[in-house]
């Protein structure tokens, strides 16, 4: 595949491998990051059971890691200053913490400005306040859980995050401070917001992300659903090794218990680092003991059902974490090797060579203004202006310096809005302005081909997609349980 910009190298996965924490302010403009990389899904839950709907259902309304990703806030209004003169009051109690009216109104103002800058409809104020209050409650519950779990964020951690944000925006730290001041956000408050994001990111990683696994069977099913030559990596063959502690058919309960105890002792030795093959040669009662217990490569359908179920999702070198019982006795199992039978090294995938021009929307550029600019630029390109020169001059994507070139891309690498519009174009044709969560794009298809893509790369891609889906589902379940277990007392009507 052709060399790509940093943006598109990141976009080879359909979603980020990690989404960091809840934002303590709904921030506005995407000033850095991959223009085509699908943003993290919103991480909110409505009240106690259902995912939050409305203003937070799209990625850029409440981005999951806006501060750490490099997003800077838009300009503030005078309402916050005027509000500081008002007497504050508690609107909700979350376990032992409180949420104040000033905090609620400030956050609602920020979300409202965000939506306006993106040319999106702003909900009725009462609905907006209700959703924002639920978001603040979720943030409180997570922060409390993180602190109770002993998770801490040092000043040095925050310093590194500040430096990273500045670098992503091509700013020095002092310039970043100036930008924050212009937006009306105090630097100390910005640091605390960053600290909160890091705290919640670490909590999520420990409680959710690190516990999610993707199994080979899931990858096979995913690829099969995609169809085509990439549907599967072939029939899997497994080489399983066993240590058998035999049990006679007429063995007493005591004899069976003793055999199980011996097998469990052998399993503990293996888990402790003992050489499996040596233990098999010394202790196994199976015919293949002299070969280190290895049964040899065979399709999973030719393995005993108990063995197949136990090893199907293991990686080579892993040991089944419990003793398996069969009519022959008790087995300690290890997956020695797994490979696809007769698998082609590569498979054909339809690829598109594409380039684009991006204009980002934000507080200084509405979607309508961006659309008008791109429409005028498209007219010039259609009448002879070089697309690459236009991209270098006007595009705000990291691919601009390469004339907007994204190289050869495979299905699923780019965000759906972009990919759908790209699929309708003929080579050489330039799209009308296309909107995504990153802004508006002009897209030009340069060519199409059937490419040989390594099967292992397809499987890596499938793994990342499946993991992202499972992580998101697990996170939503975990967050819902966390919310349900919290004691929340509303001091005012949430719709006020």
UniProtKB/Swiss-Prot annotation:
Q: Does the keyword Transmembrane helix apply?
A: no
Q: Which Pfam families match?
A: Rotamase, Rotamase_3, SurA_N
An example GO CC term for this entry is: outer membrane-bounded periplasmic space
| Class in the EC hierarchy, top level | isomerase
EC number(s) recorded for this UniProt protein: 5.2.1.8
**An annotated Gene Ontology molecular function:** peptide binding
Q: Does the keyword DNA repair apply?
A: no
Keywords, A to Z, come to: Chaperone, Isomerase, Periplasm, Repeat, Rotamase, Signal
What reaction does this catalyse?
[protein]-peptidylproline (omega=180) = [protein]-peptidylproline (omega=0)
Protein's name in the database: Chaperone SurA
């Amino acid at each position: 595949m052709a060399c790509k910009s940093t943006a598109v190298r990141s976009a080879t996965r359909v979603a980020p491998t990690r989404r960091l924490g809840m934002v303590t302010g709904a921030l506005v403009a995407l000033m850095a990051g991959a223009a085509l990389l699908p943003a993290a899904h919103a991480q909110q839950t409505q009240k106690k059971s259902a995912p939050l709907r409305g203003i937070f259902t799209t990625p850029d309304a409440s981005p999951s890691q806006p501060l750490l990703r490099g997003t800077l806030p838009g300009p503030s209004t005078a309402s916050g200053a005027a509000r500081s003169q008002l007497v504050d009051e508690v609107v909700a109690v979350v376990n032992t913490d409180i949420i104040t009216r000033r905090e609620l109104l400030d956050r609602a103002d920020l979300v409202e400005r965000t939506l306006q800058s993106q040319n999106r409809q702003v909900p009725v104020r009462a609905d907006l306040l209700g959703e924002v209050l639920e978001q603040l409650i979720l943030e409180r519950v997570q922060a409390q859980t993180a602190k109770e779990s002993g998770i801490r964020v040092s000043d040095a951690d925050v310093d590194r995050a500040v430096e990273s944000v500045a670098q992503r925006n091509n700013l020095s730290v002092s310039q970043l401070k100036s930008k924050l001041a212009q937006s009306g956000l105090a630097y100390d408050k910005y640091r605390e917001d960053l600290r909160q994001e890091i705290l919640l990111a670490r909590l999520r990683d420990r409680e959710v992300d690190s516990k999610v696994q993707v199994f080979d069977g899931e990858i096979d099913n995913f690829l099969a659903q995609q169809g085509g030559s990439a549907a599967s990596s072939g029939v899997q063959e497994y080489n399983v090794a066993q240590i058998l502690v035999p049990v006679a058919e007429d063995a007493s309960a005591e004899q069976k218990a003793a055999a199980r105890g011996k097998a469990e002792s052998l399993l503990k030795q293996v888990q402790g680092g003992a050489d499996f093959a040596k233990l098999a040669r010394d202790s196994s009662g199976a015919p293949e003991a002299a070969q280190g217990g290895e049964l040899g490569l065979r399709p999973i359908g030719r393995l005993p059902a108990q063995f197949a179920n136990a090893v199907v999702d293991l990686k080579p070198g892993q040991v089944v974490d419990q003793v398996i019982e069969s009519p022959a006795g008790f087995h300690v199992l290890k997956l020695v090797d797994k490979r696809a039978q007769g698998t082609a090294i590569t498979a054909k995938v339809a690829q598109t060579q594409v380039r684009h021009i991006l204009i980002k929307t934000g507080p200084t550029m509405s979607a309508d203004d961006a659309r008008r600019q791109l429409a005028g630029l498209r007219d010039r390109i259609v009448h002879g202006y070089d697309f690459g020169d236009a991209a270098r001059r006007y595009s705000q994507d990291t691919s601009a310096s390469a004339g907007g070139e994204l190289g050869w891309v495979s299905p699923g690498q780019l965000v759906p809005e972009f990919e759908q519009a790209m699929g309708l174009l003929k080579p050489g044709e330039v799209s009308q302005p296309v909107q995504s969560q990153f802004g508006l794009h002009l897209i030009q298809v340069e060519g199409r081909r059937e490419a040989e893509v390594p099967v292992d790369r397809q499987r890596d891609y499938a793994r990342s997609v499946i993991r992202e889906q499972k992580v998101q589902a697990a996170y939503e379940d975990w967050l819902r349980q966390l919310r349900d277990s919290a004691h929340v007392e509303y001091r005012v009507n949430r719709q006020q």
